[in-house]
Each structure stands twice: as C-alpha cells, then as structure tokens.
C-alpha cells in the first residue's frame, strides 16, 4: 500500500462519508496535531554512561497515519486519521509546536505509522525527499552536541536519513507501531489535539562514542596517524614521528583521523547505525490526546 494509495482510498472514503455515517455513526473529525520535544535538565547519557549535551536535535517528521486495526503497515488500507504534511521538530524544546491538522473520521484507532520526511512509493524508483527533510539537507535527523570521554570534550555532528530498505514493504511508512506498543483511543471529535512527543535521550542511549577518543603513541615501524588524548602523532617507520597539539587550534584528536574541529558520524559507523535503529525500532514517541474544554 503506497502513500498515494492511502490518500486515494481516504479521498474516496471521505466522498462516501454521508452514506457511511448513516450506517456506522461515524462523524468527520478534524483536530490539531502538535509535536513536542524534551528539555534536558542535565546531560543525557550515550552508551556506557558517556555524558552528552545536545545543542541541536532537529527531526523531520511526517506524514502520519492512524489506523483502526492493531497492526499498521500494509494492513492499514485506509487511515482513520491522517496528516499528509511534514514538519521539522525541535526535539530539545518542551513547548508544543503546531504541525497542522489531522483529518479523518471518528472511531477506534489502535495503530500508527509515519515517515521521517523521506517517503517511498511503488510508483517511484527513488524515495521522495519531502519538505522537512529537504530543510535538513535531505536528512531525517540532524544532531549536534558534545560528549565527554575520559575528560576530553568531543564535539560531534550526525546527519541521518531514514528511508525504506529492502527489509520493509515498499511504499509503506517506515516507522510503525509494533505488536508490543500500547496504543488505543476512541476518537470522538471532542479532542482538541494530538501531541506527539519525542525524547532525544532515547536516540543516544545506544550510541557508542568512546571509540572516537584514543590514547596511543607510535610503535616501532608504525605508519599513519594516532591520537594520544589531544595530541596527534604522525608515525614514521624510521622513528621520525611528528606530533602536534590539536587543542592549540581549538580542535580535538579523533581516532583514525587526527586533529579536527568535531566528529562527523559517518554512515558506515556503529554510532550512525545505532541512531538509525533508534529512530525506526527503538523507544517510541509518546502519543498524548488533549481533550477539548467541556
């Protein structure tokens, strides 16, 4: 089922709603969608207790579909509620951010699915980069911050695109409620809003950052670059090793690279894979229904 098929099916269902409502007592529903981040009062922890302070955590979110059945994905032929737009979520802000309007019909919803602004369709060979991801340079997540490893403050940046892989159904949103997730709500139309709340601490919990800091000096006949804390060593097999203090240029020494302003978390790294897995199959965002005033 593609996003286009979902949308077409929903358009048809909307057109037939007067007839359907007479039979099922469903009503048209429109309510606000808000996205919310989490303000960290203290440094959060990456893998092995490494303290991390984030200065930026932008997530490209959407579209979002809420389904009647307990299992989302291709079993959700017609969404009960849907929001077809995208938004960049400031995941470090606890202030609700308006994202748009959810449209649909009343009734029970038991599952959800969403993309992170990179959407695959059966009719397209390549995933479509939607507005929010485009604003982040074609990525679903941009993280910036510092980690403290063995007393060394390590600036880092991660840019993570999240899109369909060969292991998922083509054309179906990439993040879906699992059978173990608790999600149930009877949509009545009295709701004021649905809030989707993200906590970036959950994305970093499995990210390994210690390996970027190294305490090593040149060995006999060794070549290449090694780091001894903040000191970069260029090793010479003849013993004419050359060192420089990275901190003198306000840089850090990154294992395997040498002096640099910050760590760029590469797509081939374990840290990158951990971030992507956290977004697709890790801790879920919290869905909070805000009831309207009586």
Task: Name every feature range the model reports, one short phrase each.
Residues 1-12:
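Bacterial N-terminal signal peptides that target proteins for export
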Residues 2-3, 243, 256, 275:
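Short, intrinsically disordered low-complexity segments
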Residues 5, 205-210, 228-230:
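Generic secretory/membrane-interface signal
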Residues 11, 54, 236:
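Short, flexible active-site loop motifs that bind/organize anionic cofactors or intermediates
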Residues 11-14, 113:
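Detector for methionine-enriched segments
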Residues 17-20:
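C-terminal motif of bacterial Sec signal peptides marking the signal peptidase cleavage site
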Residues 22-219, 260-294:
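A short, solvent-exposed, low-complexity linear motif enriched for acidic/polar residues
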Residues 218-260:
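Cysteine-rich, disulfide-bonded extracellular modules and peptides in secreted proteins
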């Amino acid at each position: 089922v593609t996003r286009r098929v979902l949308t077409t099916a929903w358009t048809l269902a909307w057109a037939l709603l007067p007839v359907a409502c007479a039979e099922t007592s469903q009503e048209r529903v429109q309510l606000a969608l808000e996205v919310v981040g989490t303000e960290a009062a203290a440094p959060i922890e990456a893998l092995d207790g490494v303290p991390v302070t984030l200065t930026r955590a932008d997530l490209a979110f959407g579209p979002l579909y809420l389904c009647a059945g307990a299992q989302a994905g291709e079993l959700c032929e017609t969404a009960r509620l849907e929001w077809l737009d995208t938004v960049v979520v400031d995941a470090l802000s606890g202030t609700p951010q308006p994202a748009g309007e959810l449209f649909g019909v009343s009734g029970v919803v038991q599952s959800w699915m969403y993309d992170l602004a990179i959407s695959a369709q059966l009719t397209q060979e390549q995933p479509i980069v939607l507005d929010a991801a485009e604003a982040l340079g074609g990525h679903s997540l941009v993280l910036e911050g510092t980690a403290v490893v063995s007393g060394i403050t390590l600036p880092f940046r991660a840019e993570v695109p999240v899109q369909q892989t060969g292991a998922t159904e083509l054309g179906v949103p990439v993040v879906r409620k699992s059978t173990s997730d608790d999600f149930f709500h009877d949509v009545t139309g009295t709701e004021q809003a649905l809030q989707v709340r993200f906590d970036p601490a959950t994305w970093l919990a499995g990210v390994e950052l210690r390996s970027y800091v190294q305490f090593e000096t040149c060995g006999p006949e060794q070549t290449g670059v090694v780091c001894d804390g903040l000191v970069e060593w260029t090793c010479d097999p003849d013993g004419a090793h050359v060192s420089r203090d990275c901190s003198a240029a306000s840089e850090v020494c990154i294992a395997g690279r040498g002096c640099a302003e910050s760590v760029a978390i590469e797509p081939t790294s374990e840290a990158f894979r951990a971030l992507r897995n956290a977004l697709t199959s890790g801790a879920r965002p919290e869905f909070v229904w805000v009831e309207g005033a009586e």
